[in-house]
Amino acid sequence: MRVARLKEAYPTAKVELWCEDEHRLGLKPIIRKVWSPVGERPLVKVHQRYEWTYLYSFVRPKTGEVHWLILPTVNAGVFSLALEHFAREVGAGTRKRILLVLDRAGWHTGKEVEVPEGIHLEFLPSASPELQPSERLWPLSNEGVANRYFEQIEELEEVLGERCVALCNKPELIRSHTRYHWWPKAA
């Protein structure tokens, strides 16, 4: 197991297991079913447009701790900035090692990705989103923007940011959605 190998390689460092994923949201609305009185049809204003923003999540399933970033795109450069920000936030370095589990998106595996000191990347098998705990966060993050109309992408980002702050204050909810029974308990 990779966690055990990291603990062996860095015996004086604390080792934590985290995972990361990105989620695209935009002005194309997320429509969900809702309850309504018998005989009444619920209406949702829709104006399909294709402008996007990306929600990056870094989650530690063991504790439910989560860090969110709302960024304009996904590519190796932006991913490197997200990694750098995350490493600073959690204090990764010589005394704290983070094993970060992620998918094999092109911007995760490219040669131009700059991985900060203290961050170690572990890639899941290709085409296996069911193995990624972060995937379970998207229905929670979508809750604040579902069935809503946004005129501008900035409005969506503001509501999304508020939802992410609210979710940061609910570690048990995050933990219950991301802590798989087979997820290593050691870190």
How does the language model describe each region?
Residues 26-28, 108-110, 131-133:
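Short catalytic/ligand-binding loop motif for oxyanion handling, primarily in non-cytosolic enzymes
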Residues 12, 61, 95, 116-118:
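Short, well-ordered coil/turn elements that cap or connect secondary structure elements
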Residues 13-17, 134-187:
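C-terminal anion-handling pockets and recognition modules
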Residues 2-4, 9, 80-96, 123-128, ...:
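A structural preference for long, well-packed, hydrophobic secondary-structure segments
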Residues 30-43, 112-126:
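A short alpha/beta connector and helix-capping loop motif
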Residues 1-84, 180-186:
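Extended, low-complexity cationic-aromatic segments
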Residues 83, 94-108, 132:
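Acidic/histidine-rich, metal-coordinating catalytic segments
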Residues 52, 102-104, 122-144, 153-156:
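RNase H-like two-metal-ion nuclease catalytic core shared by retroviral integrases
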